[in-house]
Amino acid sequence: MILDFEESLRAFRKGSPVLIYDFEDREGETDIAIPAIHVGKDEVAMMRIDGGGLICVAIHPVAAEKLGLPFMHDVLRIASEKLPEIRKVADADDIKYDSRSSFSLWVNHRDTFTGITDVDRALTIRRIGEVVDEVMMGKKVDFGREFRSPGHVALLRAADKLTYERVGQTELSVALAEMAGIAPAVAICEMLDAETGKALTKEKAMEYAEEKGIPFIDGRTIVEHYRKFREVEVSLFV
């Protein structure tokens, strides 16, 4: 198992997976994280079989804003004005691990069939990564022309200040991508345990990382390095 932070960056730059563990006092979960632009059917199968959780794409807040991707709780709140029966669902404030979730829209690429197969989800995820890269480079993209909703890939909108504001897997994976200098869109999937019916323990996730030769990194390490990264960036422009 590789614990070195630089190895995690190198893996992301090559399009290889990294295992990210958040915090003991938060979800206490490990996610498989793969740069979206490098996701193919084999990567989707890996996340589906070895991870078992929800396959999502975490997106940088700047890209999400440019693409017009809202938080789902905002969509539900607005919808509840005309559909009052969903107000209680939209106003839920009892999330156990955070003050709010990062869910945005669920989408399929328009060239998919059902959208759920490994091939279909890979196309959706990979193209999301490419679109995020394009808008971060200043190109205008018509998101609705390529994607439809609802779909089978959940989009996650990272908090505006990333790990300075929230330290979920969404922000941790996007911060790692930003530090790696790649398109800040990352496919993530929770690792679950079929025997216990719960999240895979940190110890078992580390054993998996050791067996597969995949870098394993925790949230605290990412938060610390991202703070240093941002401080260096700011100093360059002062």
From Swiss-Prot:
Homodimer. HAMAP family: RibB. Pathway: Cofactor biosynthesis; riboflavin biosynthesis; 2-hydroxy-3-oxobutyl phosphate from D-ribulose 5-phosphate: step 1/1. D-ribulose 5-phosphate binds at residues 26-27, 31, 166-170, 190. One of its GO terms (cellular component) is cytosol. This is 3,4-dihydroxy-2-butanone 4-phosphate synthase. Its cofactor is Mg(2+); Mn(2+). Mg(2+) 2 binds at residue 27. The gene is ribB. The keyword Lipid metabolism does not apply. GO terms for biological process: riboflavin biosynthetic process.
